[in-house]
């Protein structure tokens, strides 16, 4: 099992476009032995301390294998809507790991 944590930074005014992309991307996770464990849109007061920009959303996803994650990234339906992600996401940071 691999775990992916993603910090997502949105371009100002593109929140609705990002939500539209997520409407297609998130349901496809299960097709590739994945599970969305957590999707957080933290408010301003949720941050106790930070030395990086505050993300718009934080996702934690689990996949059975690294190959499942790679296959998900190449999903034809997801790729069809990738332009929405490119239009709305300023940057994202991915952390990969395993359960200890």
Annotated model-derived regions:
Residues 1-74, 96-100:
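Short S/T/G/P-rich N-terminal loop/turn motif that feeds into the first structured element of a domain
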Residues 26, 77-83:
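A common structural junction motif
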């Amino acid at each position: 099992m691999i775990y992916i944590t993603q910090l997502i930074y949105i371009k100002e005014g593109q929140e609705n476009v990002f939500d539209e992309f997520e409407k297609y991307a998130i349901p496809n996770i299960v097709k590739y032995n994945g599970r969305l464990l957590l999707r957080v849109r933290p408010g301003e007061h949720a941050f106790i301390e930070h030395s990086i920009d505050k993300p718009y959303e934080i996702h934690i996803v689990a996949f059975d294998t690294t190959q499942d994650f790679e296959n998900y990234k190449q999903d034809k339906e997801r790729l069809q809507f990738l332009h929405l992600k490119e239009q709305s996401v300023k940057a994202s940071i991915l952390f990969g790991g395993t359960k200890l």
